[in-house]
From Swiss-Prot:
Record-given protein name: Replication origin-binding protein
Gene3D superfamilies: P-loop containing nucleotide triphosphate hydrolases
Source organism per UniProt: Varicella-zoster virus (strain Dumas) (HHV-3)
Alphabetical list of InterPro entries matching this protein: AAA+_ATPase (IPR003593), Helicase_ATP-bd (IPR014001), P-loop_NTPase (IPR027417), Replication_origin-bd (IPR003450)
Disulfide bonds: none
Subcellular location(s) per record: Host nucleus
Record's GO cellular component terms: host cell nucleus
Key words, A-Z: ATP-binding, DNA replication, DNA-binding, Host nucleus, Nucleotide-binding
Swiss-Prot/TrEMBL GO biological process terms: bidirectional double-stranded viral DNA replication; DNA replication
Assembly and oligomerization: Homodimer. Interacts with the major DNA-binding protein. Interacts with the helicase/primase component 52 and the polymerase accessory protein.
Amino acid sequence: MSPNTGESNAAVYASSTQLARALYGGDLVSWIKHTHPGISLELQLDVPVKLIKPGMSQTRPVTVVRAPMGSGKTTALLEWLQHALKADISVLVVSCRRSFTQTLIQRFNDAGLSGFVTYLTSETYIMGFKRLIVQLESLHRVSSEAIDSYDVLILDEVMSVIGQLYSPTMRRLSAVDSLLYRLLNRCSQIIAMDATVNSQFIDLISGLRGDENIHTIVCTYAGVGFSGRTCTILRDMGIDTLVRVIKRSPEHEDVRTIHQLRGTFFDELALRLQCGHNICIFSSTLSFSELVAQFCAIFTDSILILNSTRPLCNVNEWKHFRVLVYTTVVTVGLSFDMAHFHSMFAYIKPMSYGPDMVSVYQSLGRVRLLLLNEVLMYVDGSRTRCGPLFSPMLLNFTIANKFQWFPTHTQITNKLCCAFRQRCANAFTRSNTHLFSRFKYKHLFERCSLWSLADSINILQTLLASNQILVVLDGMGPITDVSPVQFCAFIHDLRHSANAVASCMRSLRQDNDSCLTDFGPSGFMADNITAFMEKYLMESINTEEQIKVFKALACPIEQPRLVNTAILGACIRIPEALEAFDVFQKIYTHYASGWFPVLDKTGEFSIATITTAPNLTTHWELFRRCAYIAKTLKWNPSTEGCVTQVLDTDINTLFNQHGDSLAQLIFEVMRCNVTDAKIILNRPVWRTTGFLDGCHNQCFRPIPTKHEYNIALFRLIWEQLFGARVTKSTQTFPGSTRVKNLKKKDLETLLDSINVDRSACRTYRQLYNLLMSQRHSFSQQRYKITAPAWARHVYFQAHQMHLAPHAEAMLQLALSELSPGSWPRINGAVNFESL
C-alpha cells in the first residue's frame, strides 16, 4: 500500500531492511494472506507461468501475475489469448515502450492472433480499433467509445507501464492517468503481469474491483538461464588496463601480456576476449558504451553497439557478433534466447539523471542464456553523494537474514525511511491524478536512491535475488555469507576505486571527442540552429563559441540546465513572473519546449527534444526562491567570465530563511532527497550514515555546522539546476581579477566597498598601499560561483538587450498572448478586463 493511502502496510515503509523487498513484491504472498485473504492466491513453484483458461470455474475478472524474467509470462499470455479470442472479443494492450509494442505485435502475428493493430501503424490520430496495442503515452488517442467497450485489458510489464506516468515524455499526464484508471475500473477482463508486482498494485486493484474478483499468481520459476547465473560485483575497474590498451603505449604494445593480470573489470574482459569468448556488455551510460567498444576493438572487429546514437538492429542479428555493447535502449520487449554469449559484463553508474536500478535490472535480463552463467559487474559510484546532505536509507535484507545489523544502524535508517515517507506524502499534493499520486512513493524512491551508492547496490541486489541470481562480492564471496561490517567495507572500497579513476575517465572521454574546426549545417538543421540561437543566446556569439555550446548540449544533463538558466534570467527581468503563475507558465513553456540542436563527438548534428514538466506549480515556487537568491547575491552567469563572488554569510542567511522549503521543492523537481538538518547534524547519525555509505572518513570528521549544511545545499541546487560550481575563493579581494592586475578604478571600487576614505590618494601606488593596509577588512570567507562556459552566451539580464534583440522580442511575443487579467495588479492598478 502506498504511504498516502492507508496504514495496513505502514510498518514496511519504516523498515530499512524490508522496504526494498516490499516495493518489488518480495513479500507479496504473506501480505495477501494477511491483508486480503479474499483474493484467490495461486503459487506456481519452479514451473513456467500458466494462466487459467478462459471459461473455467476458477476464472476471475482480474488476473495478476508476479513472476521473474524468463518465467514464460508472455508465452502464457499468448496461449491464453489463443483460447480467449472469439470473433467478437475486443482487446486493448497497453505497452510501456515503443520497442515492446513492436515485439508484441510480432509475437502476436507469429502465434496466429489476428486483427491486432498498433498505434505505430495507425493512419488516424484518434483510434478505435477492436484489437489495439498502444503505448501508454498515446492512450489519449484511443476514442472514448472504444475505451469503454474493450472486453480485455492486457498490461504486460504493468509496473513499467505505471512507471511511464513519471517519464519526461509523458505530455498529457492527467488525461492518460484518468484513462488508465478508467480501464482498470471498468474493463470486464484484466490480465496484469510483471516481475515486480507489489502490494501497492494489488491494493489498488482490490479497491477498484473487490477481493472476490481477483486471482493472483505468484511464480518462482526463473528459467535455467537466470537461476544458475552468478553476478560478481568487482572492486576495481582496472583503469590502467583500459589506458594501456586504448593508448597502446610502447611498453605494452603487445596486448597479449594482459592475460597475466586478473581481478579487475578490464583485465577480466581482456582475458575472455583473448580466449575467443563471445561477450555481451551492458553500460548504463552512453559514453562508457563507446569507450568499452573502443577497448574491445583492439581484440576483435566483430562488435555491435546499440545505444541512443546508433541504429537498432533485429535481435536475431546479434548472433553474428563476438561482442555486443548495449545501453538501456535494449530493454523490456527485446530478448536474445540463443546460447551464443559466454559471459556478460556490466558497467553501472548510479547518477541523478541516469537510469534507475529497475531499468538496469530489466536491461541485464535481455540476454537469456550465458554459456558460462557469469555476470561481471562494476558499479561506478563517482556520481553518488555522501553527507552532509545525503544519507543511505536501506540496510541489505539478505545480510539481515543471516546477520543482525547493529541496533544503532537499524534505528537511524528506520528514522530516515520515516522522514522520506513524510516528504513523499507532501509531494505532488496539487496533482489531480489517480495513479500518478498513488504510486509516487515508488517512483521517488527509485530516483532518489540513485544519489546513494549503498542504496543503489541494495536495490539492484534485491531485484537480482528475485530472479534467483546469486550476487557475489569480489574478494568476500556470496552476499549471503557477508557480514554488515564486510558489506560496508566493500562499499567503501568501491567508492574509493570510483573516485580514484573519475578524472582519468573524464580525460579518456575528452580524448575521444573530435576537435571540430568547421561546421556548416544546411536546410532543416540550419533553420533549427538559427531558431535556437535567436531564442536563447546573445547575438555576440561567434562560430567557435557556437560549436562549444552545441557540443556541451550533447550531454543530456546540460540541456535542462540551459533551459533553467534562461528561465531564471527571464524571471529576474520580468518580476511579474514571480507574482503571477500564468506569467511564469508562459515563460516556462516558451523556453522548455521545442528542440535543441546538439553536436556529437563525430561532428554530426542531431535534434534533442525539450521536455516540459507536469508539476509547474512546484517549478514556479522553486524559481521564485531561486530568483530571489540570485538577485540578492547579484549572480549573473553571463558576465565577468561566468564567475561571481559572494560572502558565505549571505548564503547562510538566505538558506536559513528558505532552506526547508527548498529541500521539499528540489525533492519534487530534482528527485533529490536531502536529509533534514535536524536529523543529520548529530553525531550518531553523522557517523552511522557515513559508515553505511562507504564514506568512512566521515566517521572521524567533525559534525558539520548548520552554516556548512546551508552552503552545501546552495552548492547542490546551483550545480544541479544551472550547472554552476560553488567553491571557496582563495583570492585576497573580491572579483575575478588577481591583485597584480587590478586597475586604478578597481582599487577605488574596493576601497569604497568598505567605506575607506581615499581622498588623500592620487596615484595608483597610494591607492594600492591603502588597500593593502585594509586587507583585513576582506578576510571574511567568500565563495566563487562559476557558471558553465556556455552560460556566458545565454541571454540573462535586461542590460544585455542590445545584444539579444531576437531573444527578448521572441519572449515578449509569447507573453503578448496572455490576457490582461493574467498579469498581477499591484498598487491599485485597474483591472481592465472588468470594465
